[in-house]
Amino acid sequence: MNPVKRLLYVFGALPIIVFAGCGSVPLKQYYTLNYLPSSQRERLNSNAYPCVVRLRDFNIEEAYDRPQIVYRQSPFQLQYDYYRAWAVKPARMITDLVYKHLLTANLVSGVVRRFDEGPRPDFELSGMIEALDEYDSRELWFAHIALRMTLSRISDGSVLFEKRFDLRKRVYEHKPENVIRELSSLLEYIMIQSVRDMDVRLAKEYGIALPQADTSSSSPATGEIR
């Protein structure tokens, strides 16, 4: 959606009352990513591994480290929507959802956010948010998220798991709330795949045989998700 159409959409969605030549100003709308993690759905081993993971606050590219929701019409230009904003800082919002997902998945015996809040962690999960935006291509809308995650052993820094996702999902009904809904579903997809991959790596780390199943990661990490 181009800037002119976007403004028409915002103003068209709200009543415009004119008093003495002055028009009303549209209200800001605040959004947050959200989904309910499903317990055990992505697990290959039903038991938690005997270790503690420290979830480090995710980093985010500077262009996306702001309250305004980002939209783009080309790979070379970013635009910021003044009337649509995140209710929580994007990096904190995504880290919080990752934390909830890890707890629900029961992947490990403990997940902490700080070193001083519980048992000493064995591993650290970190992430970099490279993109979080709405892509408008003429008549097509897409939700887009790019994210890299790394699970490393704290004692020696060795990496057990590292994966980069760059995914988009088409938004068929062109409403801002639907973009947020599809961004949420993309993050859930990323976490399901990541937990499955970490399940395999941790099983190997602890010498645990997994049930007979395809332990390879066959789901795409880049491109369009339908």
For every predicted segment, state its role.
Residues 52-57, 70, 124-130, 144-150, ...:
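Soluble periplasmic/extracytoplasmic beta-strand elements of cell-envelope proteins
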Residues 99, 103-107, 195-199, 203:
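Sec-exported extracytoplasmic/periplasmic mature domains
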